[in-house]
Amino acid sequence: KTKFSQNYENKNEIKYANSKHSNFPEPVRLFIDFLNSNTYLNFLQNLTSIQEELVADPQLNGGGLHEIKKGGVLKIHTDFNRHPTLNLDRRINILIYLNKNWKDQYGGHLELWDKSMTKCRKKILPIFNRMVIFSTNDFSYHGHPEPVSCPEGESRKSIALYYFSKGRPLSEIDYSKIKNKTYFEDRLGFKNETDGQSKGPKNFLRSFKFYKSIKNFEKKYLRRKKK
């Protein structure tokens, strides 16, 4: 057991999280250190066939230990796509479930949805010692939208780790989305299920390549002159 440092309670997510490495029990720290090691990074590189070099995040931004109690949810979403402090793109999510004797009727299935958010392609029960590795990009919708129905005193627990690279394929980018934002989306047939991100005029412009070119020019030349 460990003390959780963050409590999320809103329409999109009801969960606890702790990303402070020093708060974890020693076995958890050692396990996370291994998953962030060069040995494991090489394994991931070969497994995923990602061309860009994968980089671990020892800061555990958004990762670490997660816990969801009875009634908790994590609505379908795409993750933030950039590291908050490093110039890196997010590429891979790893989830390790810690739920002994977890039953199907407890729910909490990880759902992987298609790019158009019209169909759930895969449901994964969060049973003990199960690891899920999946690509994270601007179209990789996932979550567990149905409230967990485990008994009182039980909870859905997991370790979450994220891996990054410098650059990513254009096919993984949705220019209408703001960098470093989590986007929650309603499932087909569920109206106002989430508090989604606003898509105003600026976001609309981001869908055009000329807008991206202008912004890159601004960053490269105009902002540099101001410094």
Model-derived features: positions:
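Amphipathic alpha-helical recognition patches that constitute DNA-binding helices
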Residues: 64, 93, 158
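A short coil-to-beta-strand element that immediately follows conserved catalytic motifs
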Residues: 51-62, 106
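Catalytic core of Fe(II)/2-oxoglutarate
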Residues: 71, 81-90, 99-227
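Conserved short histidine dyad/triad with adjacent acidic residue
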Residues: 48, 66-84
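Proline-centered turn/helix-capping motifs that create local helix->coil transitions or kinks
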Residues: 1-4, 52, 100-104
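Short, conserved, surface-exposed binding loops centered on an aromatic residue
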Residues: 33, 54-57, 66-67, 84-88
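Non-heme Fe(II)/2-oxoglutarate
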Residues: 1-47
